[in-house]
């Protein structure tokens, strides 16, 4: 069985690199994109998990979640953003209600052990 594929979407390359490394520690193949254009060019539905920053310039993270839900995308999502936990939880609930498969949220700065546990749980 091949390793799950994870796509990290974050405009901060250092943060994206951390998320990629943590996903790899969790046994996944991982890639990162840093712009709205690169995200739109990626075949998101071919990934098992999307780690999504809601605040990428040129991209509305809430709209991305809505579109994933509306088209019944099979990709699971973890939201990682600098927003407060309450806002992230509300965004996740709204996205789930619209059909997106949001498996967890985390405020930045990420805690490596917690992110690894979220990734493992999302893919279980």
Task: State each model region's role.
Residues 46-48, 71-78, 101-102:
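His-Asp phosphorelay/catalytic-motif detector in bacterial-type signaling
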Residues 53:
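Active-site residues of response regulator receiver
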Residues 86-87, 107-123:
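C-terminal output helix
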Residues 31-49:
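Acidic, metal-coordinating helix/loop segments flanking the phosphotransfer/catalytic sites
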Residues 2-14, 19-23:
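Conserved acidic segment of CheY-like receiver
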Residues 34-35, 60-66:
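Acidic catalytic/metal-coordinating carboxylates
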Residues 63, 83-105:
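Alpha4 helix (beta4-alpha4-beta5 surface) of REC/receiver domains from two-component response regulators
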Residues 57:
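The feature encodes the CheY-like receiver
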């Amino acid at each position: 069985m091949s390793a799950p594929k994870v796509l990290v979407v974050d405009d901060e390359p250092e943060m994206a690199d951390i998320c990629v490394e943590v996903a790899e520690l969790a046994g996944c193949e991982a890639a990162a994109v840093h712009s709205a254009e690169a995200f739109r060019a990626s075949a998101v539905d071919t990934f098992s998990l999307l780690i999504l920053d809601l605040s990428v310039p040129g991209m509305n993270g809430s709209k991305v979640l809505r579109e994933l839900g509306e088209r019944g995308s099979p990709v699971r999502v973890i939201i990682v953003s600098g927003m407060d936990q309450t806002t992230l939880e509300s965004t996740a609930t709204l996205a789930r209600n619209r059909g997106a498969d949001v498996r967890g949220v985390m405020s930045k700065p990420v805690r490596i052990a917690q992110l690894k546990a979220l990734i493992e749980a999302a893919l279980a």
